[in-house]
From Swiss-Prot:
Alphabetical keyword list: Riboflavin biosynthesis, Transferase
Pathway where it operates: Cofactor biosynthesis; riboflavin biosynthesis; riboflavin from 2-hydroxy-3-oxobutyl phosphate and 5-amino-6-(D-ribitylamino)uracil: step 1/2
Pfam families named among the record's database cross-references: DMRL_synthase
Keyword Magnesium: no
Impact after mutating W27 to F/Y: Minor effects on the kinetic properties
Record-stated family: Belongs to the DMRL synthase family.
Protein name (database record): 6,7-dimethyl-8-ribityllumazine synthase
Lineage: Eukaryota, Fungi, Dikarya, Ascomycota, Taphrinomycotina
Active site per UniProt: H94 (proton donor)
Amino acid sequence: MFSGIKGPNPSDLKGPELRILIVHARWNLQAIEPLVKGAVETMIEKHDVKLENIDIESVPGSWELPQGIRASIARNTYDAVIGIGVLIKGSTMHFEYISEAVVHGLMRVGLDSGVPVILGLLTVLNEEQALYRAGLNGGHNHGNDWGSAAVEMGLKALY
């Protein structure tokens, strides 16, 4: 479990009526899968979100997250969305361009639609950091935090 002052305080909010969408990239699935699982388990176990109210979709990569989320919320009603991707820095500037564009794109989709979009984007320097932040190798699973954030922001949007 996470310890230290960094990170959100635990939330005891309950959202059994919430409809949540998770859209994840298919790049770096070894880290993506536990992040998605952590978000889902946290929403169900800690916040009483019903499994049947959680939809999970995928897009090719993190670049496509904003577009995929925008298309999904245009077709269906959701109270909150989590966009999950993992970007691992390489030897070119590609990492910087993609990470900045995705962050801005996710914020824009949330502001334009009125549906809270949780930033579930890990931007890391290597695979080891990605796995650690996905709760593997003794690390804290950031998907847990994103699940709690989706419930809190979904409730804010609903009420």
